[in-house]
């Protein structure tokens, strides 16, 4: 091998060894392997039956559904409108100081505003960097003064271990290449003497 290729070979070898040692130190956790138990147990399949909880009047959240409810245990639900407590709810018990509504005709319809769907809603995006708008303050007999509000940009600073290790490997690799290039150049300056 000539002197130039020998230096590059050593640089590549050192870089490969450095990368391998960094990879081994990164995967320091050894797998915890245990032998499976030798005894076997017979698994008996069981079926899980879920019972439906009894339906109560409290499960209804609107006047119409409460009044139209027909429960399995013949309970009549009544929509209660308690103005003093500012509370409306469905119950099977009558409460004093509350207005009872037993038919859908007595249920008041609350006007609702239409909720935009995905097809009509415009997506709102947050600006990537806040751009404060300057405000101009003027007073009688004074000069215009422009005041720009200051705000801190959002930062997500987290430590990334993989990038840190990659940076170390990169710096050490560059240093190894520079070192071997320096050694190569120094070896060319020597005078060779015959024996």
UniProtKB/Swiss-Prot annotation:
Comp. bias regions, Polar residues: 141-152
Organism the protein comes from: Rattus norvegicus
Pfam family, one: MGC-24
GO terms for cellular component: endosome; endosome membrane; lysosomal membrane; lysosome; plasma membrane
Tissue expr: Ubiquitous. Expressed at highest levels in the liver, kidney, lung and intestine.
Processing and modification events after translation: Highly N- and O-glycosylated; contains sialic acid.
Cytoplasmic-side segments: 182-195
Entry membrane topology: Single-pass type I membrane protein
Matching InterPro entries: CD164_MGC24 (IPR007947)
Glycosylation sites: 26, 32, 68, 74, 86, 97, 118, 144
Any GO BP annotation: muscle organ development
Described function: Sialomucin that may play a key role in hematopoiesis. May be involved in cell adhesion. Promotes myogenesis by enhancing CXCR4-dependent cell motility. Positively regulates myoblast migration and promotes myoblast fusion into myotubes.
Keywords, alphabetical: Cell adhesion, Cell membrane, Endosome, Glycoprotein, Lysosome, Membrane, Myogenesis, Signal, Transmembrane, Transmembrane helix
UniProt topological domain (Extracellular) ranges: 24-160
Keyword Ribosomal protein listed: no
Subcellular location: Cell membrane; Lysosome membrane; Endosome membrane
Biased composition (Low complexity): 119-140
Protein's UniProt name: Sialomucin core protein 24
Native organism taxonomy: Eukaryota, Metazoa, Chordata, Craniata, Vertebrata
Keyword NAD: no
Gene from which this protein is expressed: Cd164
Superkingdom, natural source: Eukaryota
Chain intervals for the UniProt region annotation (Disordered): 27-47, 114-154
PANTHER family linked: MUCIN/PORIMIN, SIALOMUCIN CORE PROTEIN 24
Subunit structure: Interacts with CXCR4.
Signal peptide bounds: 1-23
Family affiliation: Belongs to the CD164 family.
Residues spanning the membrane: 161-181
Region feature Required for endosomal and lysosomal localization, mapped onto this chain: 189-195
